[in-house]
Regions:
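Extracellular Ser/Thr-rich, low-complexity/disordered mucin-like segments
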Residues: 205-239, 249
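Compositionally biased, low-complexity repeat tracts
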Residues: 2, 13, 221, 226, ...
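Soluble mature domains adjacent to a membrane tether on cell-surface and organelle-surface proteins
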Residues: 2-206
Length: 266
């Protein structure tokens, strides 16, 4: 599936007892949890905005003062809205300490970044494709988070990651996969799919992975009902060694105010 707009969350699931990372596609009716090898996110030309030439965004390097393709932290109806959550009922039940998204690499033209903004505090970089080391982001239990995703160049791209978690019995689980993007209006979704199949290729968009069943109860009540209002209040929970601990609550009133304070449409 190629997804060009609407709400998408990646999140850990237990499918037939297997710990995996899937993408919940709310643009489908009913919503469905898709394999990350099938879901290709197109970041359209309408997402291009001016990157602030401000020291607060020094982690964006030469991208400052230039136009870039941005999936915003707060929803823009013209653009796909990518986040993550740990709200699947079986994850809430079996992984009380949440899970980690560990970013391990980027393939494709230019640079890719992800960062989060929290009101008047300085933006915090969560992922920088120019760094070679693993970059872990902790996902608190039963939370739903959105961040800013920034791409410098158009074209097919992937971001490799591994989801890791320790269940209530102390058993460690991990699952490597890739998020697949086509940046810009041109380019083929198939190009992104052909950039190396990941372990998630074995997980199909089957009835066991659909989001229209009881598996959506927690996430629907806590967050997705407010997606149309496009408001986010992000809470930074702390930093432990190199892991960034992030929690977020979905609000219902502020639309694009947080984004417009620093990101001006080009």
């Amino acid at each position: 599936a190629e997804i060009t707009r609407g709400h998408v969350d990646v999140g850990p699931r237990l499918i037939d007892g297997k710990f995996v990372l899937l993408a919940r596609d709310d643009s489908a009716n009913p919503p469905v949890w898709r394999s990350t090898d099938d879901a290709v996110l197109r970041v359209v030309d309408a997402s291009r905005i001016d990157v602030p030439n401000d020291d607060a965004y020094s982690f964006l390097g030469d991208m400052r003062g230039r136009k870039a393709y941005v999936i915003p932290q707060t929803q823009d109806q013209k653009i796909v809205w990518l986040g993550w959550n740990t709200q699947a009922p079986e994850i809430v039940k079996n992984f009380p300490r949440g899970a980690e998204l560990v970013f391990t690499g980027h393939e494709g033209p230019g640079e890719a970044h992800m960062f989060i903004e929290n009101g008047f505090e300085a933006p915090m970089s969560l992922y920088d494709s120019t760094k070679s080391e693993q970059q872990p982001v902790h996902m608190e239990a039963n939370t739903h988070v959105h961040a800013n995703w920034v791409f410098s160049e158009p074209g097919a791209q992937t971001i490799s990651m591994e989801v890791r978690g320790t269940d209530a019995k102390g058993v460690k689980h991990s699952y490597p996969t890739k998020l697949r993007f086509v940046i810009g209006d041109k380019g083929s979704a198939q190009d992104a799919r052909s950039m190396g199949a990941s372990a998630s290729a074995t997980i199909a968009d089957s009835p066991t992975a659909t989001a229209s069943s009881d598996s959506t109860a927690a996430s629907s009540d806590a967050s997705h009902g407010s997606s149309s209002h496009g408001a986010i209040i992000a809470i930074i929970a702390g930093v432990v060694i190199v892991a960034i601990v992030v929690a977020a609550l979905i609000g219902r009133s502020r639309s694009r105010a947080m984004r417009d304070e620093v990101w001006q449409d080009g």
